[in-house]
A protein has these predicted regions:
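Bacterial Sec-dependent N-terminal signal peptides
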Residues: 1-23
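N-terminal, polar/Ser/Thr-rich
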Residues: 18-38, 48-52, 155
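Coil residues (strongly favoring Ser/Thr
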Residues: 28, 51, 115-118, 250
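Surface-exposed loops/turns
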Residues: 33, 129-130
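Ligand-binding face of N-terminal immunoglobulin V-set domains in extracellular IgSF glycoproteins
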Residues: 38-64, 69, 80
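Extended, low-hydrophobicity, Ser/Thr/Pro/Gly-biased non-transmembrane segments
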Residues: 80-99, 111-117, 122-124, 135-234
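Juxtacatalytic substrate-recognition/specificity segment
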Residues: 195, 224, 242-346, 352-360
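Acidic/His/Gly-enriched intrinsically disordered linker/tail segments
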Residues: 350-429
Length: 429
């Protein structure tokens, strides 16, 4: 099938500005010495279903770190990540809900289930189809160390946050609500955000939202951000920012993922080529800026490249950086524009990304071998693997997965995947 045939299917899923269903207004204050963000949030939840709603569910994933028995903690145990269970309570993090009120500040009844990162809010009146209901919420987020998920507080006192606000669950005849299991798969319908963030003056706020204003008074920096039709808001609050911005004629790309052996001008040219390639094959990216962090790559690296020690470099340096950035940029593009359930329909984004990567390799590196320059060594010439093209890795790994009885259906929810399939295998089916 031709690439544009695949992309026509993607086009059916890509969100448009008119589709934004909810409005979230946030006034947040960072208190570094207390590891805390205090938040006042207003949520205008629009019922776009045909059902009458009597309740609204919220994802409170900041509270998924609160004990050793949460679904997230159990996930860490399954993956043999014992550090979370032996960590001090103060370093795990949690949320503290002060109040949840209606539009006239009347308190509403709310509760948590056994999964402490899900909140059920009982409405004081019916929410009819097409109508909106306003929630006013006040709460505190105590942030965990970043060593558990790479998000949280770093050793240097920086704050890297992803699931830090109360997010409304998706209702499509039934509530799509589930707990945080460190899968980066929060499900939020396209939402408009207005955020005012107060930090000490020496912090730099990194975000892909539009910057409205930034002022500093009495050593407090207030940054106002705006974003339309967003499905996630990741922020980094850094004392010394290592992000560099590359300006292309399509969008701004801000990143701290780099390569020591590639000069900044070459890095910029590579990023520009990737952006133009995706623009040609996927259409315009709907936002003016894209932020790509080292966390994005560490959590979803190019399989194979991440396993090699630094002193072994079978691939050209520009190829390594090119394919790493292509994976980050294409993944970010798809995650920010495809309104799909990332836990149930995770395979959609994964499959499109693998296809795009294969086509990119065919276009710019048609002769690249799976073993890179090692394929030229005579000792490897006796092995079939030395003859494999770089793109052969996908079918090769799939067959290896099948032989080892690791295969699982693509329709399997992501939290039921084996670790190998969660990280690698499912995208290759």
């Amino acid at each position: 099938m031709k690439l544009n045939h695949y992309i026509s299917l993607v086009g059916l899923l890509i969100v448009t500005l008119a589709q934004a269903q909810h409005q979230i207004n946030i006034d947040a204050t960072l208190v570094p010495e207390l590891r805390t963000i205090t938040i006042e949030q207003e949520l205008a939840y629009k019922n776009d279903s045909d059902s009458i709603l009597h309740e609204i569910y919220l994802s409170d994933w900041a509270n998924s770190f609160s004990s050793k028995t949460t679904p997230l903690a159990k996930r860490f145990s399954e993956n043999y990540q014992g550090s979370f269970h032996f960590e001090k309570n103060k370093n795990r993090g949690h949320s503290n809900i002060v109040s949840i009120n209606n539009n006239i500040k009347k308190p509403l009844v709310w509760s948590r289930g056994d999964e402490v990162d899900i909140i059920r809010v009982q409405l004081d009146k019916k929410l009819l189809p097409g109508e909106a209901y306003i929630l006013k919420m006040e709460y505190h987020i105590i942030l965990p160390d970043d060593k558990f998920t790479r998000y949280g507080i770093t050793n240097s006192g920086d704050f890297k946050i992803r699931y830090w606000y109360l997010a409304p669950a998706v209702f499509d005849g039934g509530w799509n609500i589930y707990s945080n299991k460190d899968l980066n798969d929060s499900y939020l319908n396209p939402t408009n955000f207005n955020i005012k963030f107060h930090t000490p003056y020496n912090f730099n706020l990194i975000s892909d939202l539009d910057l409205v204003s930034e002022i500093t008074e009495n050593k407090i920096k207030t940054t106002q951000l705006k974003g339309e039709n967003r499905m996630q808001v990741k922020l980094q609050l850094l004392k010394n920012s290592d992000f560099k911005t590359i300006k292309t004629d399509k969008l701004l790309v801000s990143t701290n993922h780099t390569h020591l052996k590639i000069t900044p001008p070459i890095q910029a040219l590579i990023i520009d080529r990737i952006v133009h390639y995706l623009n040609k094959n996927l259409g315009d990216y709907p936002f003016d800026k894209m932020v790509l962090s080292e966390i994005d790559y560490k959590r979803n690296p190019v399989y194979g490249l991440n396993l090699l020690p630094e002193f072994i470099s079978p691939f050209p340096n520009d190829f390594e950086y090119d394919i790493e950035m292509f994976k980050i940029i294409s993944r970010t593009y798809l995650e920010n524009t495809l309104a799909v359930n990332p836990r149930e329909d995770h395979w959609i984004i994964g499959a499109f990304q693998v296809y795009l990567m294969m086509e990119y390799i065919k276009t710019y590196y048609p002769n690249m071998k799976l073993a890179g320059n090692l394929s030229n060594l005579w000792i490897l010439g006796i092995f079939h693997a030395s003859e494999l093209e770089f793109n052969d890795q996908y079918s090769f790994l799939y067959m290896n997965m099948a032989r080892n009885n690791l295969h699982q259906k693509n329709t399997t929810p992501k939290d039921y995947f084996l670790e190998f399939n969660k990280n690698i295998g499912s995208d290759y089916y």
